[in-house]
Amino acid sequence: MIGAPLLVAAAALVDGDGRVLVQQRSAGPLAGLWELPGGKLEPGETPAAALVRELGEELGIDVETACLAPAAFASEALGDRHLILLLHVCRKWRGVPRALEASALRWVRPVELHALAMPAPDRPLIGLLEALI
């Protein structure tokens, strides 16, 4: 039996040149992999509220929930749980993103995401980002 789903919100921050921001994980079993910024929802938290919090913590930027457009989701078995990744697109924020928790940040075109080592749940979102941006 699979336990309760693990809800994770991710943001595709899109700059004026149509590039998406990815960050490189610095620790844990996924260290070195590139991923879209975001994180787990806390109890009672909406995906948009989680992203506002996570983007502030991880990148030092301010985002308003109205600037987060739900775009897609991906799901992946994760041990005895099921991870559901909720993707939002964001084109407007305040501040300059900085790697506060990640090893590095990189702006890439969606097609370039194919060449990056990314966690399995992020990979199905690449084609969608190519179509959207």
Predicted regions and their residues:
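Residue-level signal for inorganic ion chemistry
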Residues: 11, 105, 109
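Conserved Nudix-box catalytic region and its N-terminal flanking loop in Nudix hydrolases
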Residues: 19-57
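C-terminal structural segments of small proteins and small subunits
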Residues: 110-119, 123
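Charged phosphate-binding loop/patch that engages nucleotide di/tri-phosphates or the phosphate backbone
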Residues: 123-133
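Conserved N-terminal beta-strand and adjoining loop/helix that marks the start
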Residues: 1-20, 40, 73
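Short, charged, solvent-exposed linker or helix-capping segments at domain edges/interfaces
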Residues: 97-102, 117-119
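A short coil-to-beta-strand element that immediately follows conserved catalytic motifs
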Residues: 62-72
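Active-site-adjacent beta-strand/loop module that shapes the phosphate/pyrophosphate-binding cleft
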Residues: 6, 15, 72-96, 106, ...
